[in-house]
């Protein structure tokens, strides 16, 4: 870190009042705080803090797109395919008959600034309000109606001040109202806390049942994701198994290793680069923090205000948590806590973290690249369908058997169904694959046609005459084996591959970059680089040079992949296919019955590093068989809408389609990925109109049929197939469009692949705009067809989405 950067860090640290996480930043006297605590002692309430950071879960509640599509108003379900009986990780929420949630506004005279004091004064009146109540500082929720619409209560503070509290009924909320849905989630988070589960990020974990992997210095906390929403058939809780990986070494250990590796001079710069942006866990309060900066001039001996006195960080942790800090010279970490300050104001200042007490969460890139670590982790985290279902059932049973949890639910007249939801899905038939002049079927249960395609010529592939292969001296044998095997496998595939010019480089990044600069010219069609390891920085440097500085198709392969002779034919075949694709080859196709159709895929990548820009990506099909694609990436500023940069890209794609086909597409179907919770409003209200503007720019009389589909891959929904007493993953092609879909959306799930281990993840498709009039059956079938067109694997996958993710 430069001297200027250190000065900025010092300025940020000094410019705001700082405190240890969990320390009370007093805005009033200690006697006043004590009075509040005494008044509120013994009262249980659902706190606003239990709602903190959760409101975005419900922002998509108000997006009602289905009502605008006449052809799916009555029914959005398909009928084709073979019915299949499934269970899903959903549990119905049950409530007593005529259940209503009563909402009250609470007013204090004189006004009380402290929300905590307001709660304490209000909850003095338990006889009037009852034991079950939820108060967020302004609104009071009760499971029963008070005798009068306006109830006036009187309280006295500890210092004798009289306070009048007016409680006014403002709303009677039915179980399906958005406020009630949010309220159910608040109550359930209360239940999870009763079960001694700890919130980390958006999920809850059980620190009392850790899974230790000592050989890798890792610990796994098992936990669950939970969301309660209104679905097609009922209000249900969707819950799935989650795992949080914690490292056994502290941030101080990592800093010591960095100092040893890079020396004192470069340590500040390297340390900041490695640590800033990472998430840490402080076990003394089980909270997570993002490292935003490093306070190079702060140590545990520095002090901060606690009440009216100054206390050092070292003494604070000793008195508050009984923790001894061994290294008094370690610098502190800065985390800009997002929580609001008193009365909704800005936070008083950043949290200062002691590295010795912080544990990194998640995995580093180096860990992810370590096969042994990932294999050992997967034995605990990659659950088979039967194990996952068993864990979910055990979770709900635990809630039902815990007396405190049941008492909390009983107070509100709520309960959960004891069993997973049963529903009926449909399995679409497998597709015929067309390759060259041949066609073939595949096993629909495995969704893999790598065997069937062997020995068959591809649809189209340009000859590869001028190409380079780079390798180190140590990897000479592996590189030669790859060249020879590529020659063997290319003939049957109809590929014409000449021998490459082989370039040897020293095994370090600078040497490889120089070798690329000296040898890659405009006449080179392809560059293959054999890497000695899967270090991300080396791979990134190759791709950056060959994508940005000297655009040339490239293929990287790790030498270890080539070291097993028995697998070399398979590996070489896959490499040959990828090389062909990158030069514009077409491998196989499926039957697409819709004519003059353009498929568009849109995604956005957000770099979480401070100050970095987002990247928007668009791909668009150019031919009937969906085997040729237009692609464009654009850099965007943070916060900029994705379509601002991609409007011109879509216009360019339409012009390319016109050149390729001598006509414009009569139908356009856009698959939009990368839409997070709470962002659906933006897609519906902004992006759709931007897409339409791009289309109009071609000509005012050009009005193709348009469909926009939001795709979500990272979802919690899981489905299980029971057969002869055994639990399996649903087969590829399974469609679910009832029960667990949302009533206000035209949405469906597709299981589009088979997995060898663990539980399969379905993909959620939400049609947010549609003038095509396609029946649900046709929309689902077309989407499944496109899943066959991802050329990186000879298996079914989410084609358009994966091409955007890979940047092909």
Give the residues covered by each predicted segment.
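Long, low-complexity, intrinsically disordered terminal regions
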Residues: 2-808
